[in-house]
Structure formats: structure tokens, C-alpha cells
Amino acid sequence: MAVPQPFPSGPHLQPAGALMEPQPSPRSLAEGFLQEELRLNDELRQLQFSELVGIVYNPVEYAWEPHRSYVTRYCQGPKQVLFLGMNPGPFGMAQTGVPFGEVSVVRDWLGLGGPVRTPPQEHPKRPVLGLECPQSEVSGARFWGFFRNLCGQPEVFFRHCFVHNLCPLLLLAPSGRNITPAELPAKQREQLLGVCDAALCRQVQLLGVRLVVGVGRVAEQRARRALASLMPEVQVEGLLHPSPRSPQANKGWEAVAKERLNELGLLPLLTS
């Protein structure tokens, strides 16, 4: 594994190739980000999946109100660091529209709310209850709980950082089991992640991101692949995923995360 480079200080390096129009004013940055997400939604609607996938949830559509509140409140200016997840979990973003969106954190720490509609197709084993969902998402509770303890207030975290998922879709088997993008047949997987990779490049440039931290190895690898040719000046690093399925994360993810952020030189950006 390559030795991580400390997070650089100083002015942001401009991309070698123009991917989009110059960055808008802070007032319209959130609007521009939301427009990019809607553009991605349009592209994703054109995709078709095999019988392996029974139902597709897109919380950026049916949980638009809390998702829009998240972006407009916390993405008002350029971001140096983007923490990148892979795709929604059934009890996190699928319920709240917020990446790693553990209900209690979204409601009580991020201060977000709003109506969440029922998806066009809803699996009986995966009901969408929005902020009324009683089940906790362990990954989200660990992720946001760590930053709540570290930063104190969400405004401290979001001064320089933002959290986003590469793919907005939750894929469910006919049984209701969660299907990761990695489980899709190769052609479908590359079609899906190809459009998400292209969207990521546009989003990274829009926000002025200098460092992408992939939360989990898959997100890190996809970010490297997406940005390597179009935006090679953007640094990509990884952070252990806080999943309860990870024995290493279960031994103390918070300590691992803090050590990793210290290696990357990010702690000064995350403390007041």
C-alpha cells in the first residue's frame, strides 16, 4: 500500500482539463450540485438490470426534501475534502436521503427533516419510513458519531468537508436482500458505475475538491479509477469502512479513523 501523503496546504490546483463551466458563486454551488445529481438520475433511469435485481430505490428522488436540505445547508461553499461512500444502505440514506444517514444523527445533529415519499416500488421487507424508521444503521451511527465527537458542531465538519455517495441507488433482490454494485454482472456493473464515475468527476470539480477519501476499499478504488485520467491532480486515499461486517471496524473503528485522518493531515481541518 502506498504511503499516504499529508494533506497539502496552499491554493487549490486547477484541473488540467475543463470538465464543466467555471465554479459558480457560493450561493449557487448547492444548486449546481443538486443539478448534477438530477442529471445523474436521468442517466440512471435509462439503465436496465437483470433479474438479479428485483427493485431499485433512489432516495435522491423519493427522499428529495431532506436530501435537498442536506445539500443546501451544508454545501454552500467549496470543499477541500470529499468523503465518498459507495451507495445507500437500507436503514440509512434509503430512509433519510443523507449519506450514511442514521436517522437519529440526521434529525438530532444535522438538524434535517422533511417528508419522505414512498418509492414507486417498495419491497415489503424494506419499507421506507423516513425519519420514523426505528432501525439503526450501524455504519452511519459510527461514521457520523465519530465526527460529532471530533467536531462538536456540524458546521465545523462542513467548513472544509462534504459527504457523498458515488451511486445513489439501493439495489434489492426479489427476496429483499441488499445487492452491492460489485455483485452485478460485469457489463451492468460497468454501465452503472461508469455514469456514476463521470458524475463524480463533475461533482469533484464543481466543489473544488483536493482530496477524496473513499470510505471502504471499493469506493476508494472507484474514485481512483474515475479521477485518474481526467483529474489526476486530485489526491485519493482510503478510510476503513465502519461496517459491522468488518471485524477490524468492530474492534474500534473510531480509533482507526482518527489515526488515519491524522496520517492524512486532516485533523486540523476538523477541529475548531
Curated annotation (Swiss-Prot):
Chain ranges passing through the membrane = none
Positions bound to substrate: M86, F100, N165, H241
User: Which GO cellular component term is one of those annotated?
Assistant: nucleolus
Pfam annotation, one family = UDG
Q: Region DNA-binding: start and end of each range?
A: 175-189
- State the organism named in the record: Bos taurus
Which keywords, in A-to-Z order, does the entry hold?
Answer: DNA damage, DNA repair, DNA-binding, Hydrolase, Nucleus
GO MF annotations, alphabetized: DNA binding; DNA N-glycosylase activity; oxidized pyrimidine nucleobase lesion DNA N-glycosylase activity; single-strand selective uracil DNA N-glycosylase activity; uracil DNA N-glycosylase activity
Annotated spans, Disordered: 1-27
Gene Ontology biological process:
base-excision repair
Per the record, the domain of life is: Eukaryota
Entry EC number(s): 3.2.2.-
Q: Which gene encodes it?
A: SMUG1
Family membership noted in the UniProt record:
Belongs to the uracil-DNA glycosylase (UDG) superfamily. SMUG1 family.
This chain belongs to which protein, by name?
Single-strand selective monofunctional uracil DNA glycosylase
Instruction: Please describe what this protein does.
Output: Recognizes base lesions in the genome and initiates base excision DNA repair. Acts as a monofunctional DNA glycosylase specific for uracil (U) residues in DNA with a preference for single-stranded DNA substrates. The activity is greater toward mismatches (U/G) compared to matches (U/A). Excises uracil (U), 5-formyluracil (fU) and uracil derivatives bearing an oxidized group at C5 [5-hydroxyuracil (hoU) and 5-hydroxymethyluracil (hmU)] in ssDNA and dsDNA, but not analogous cytosine derivatives (5-hydroxycytosine and 5-formylcytosine), nor other oxidized bases.
Cellular location of this protein?
Answer: Nucleus
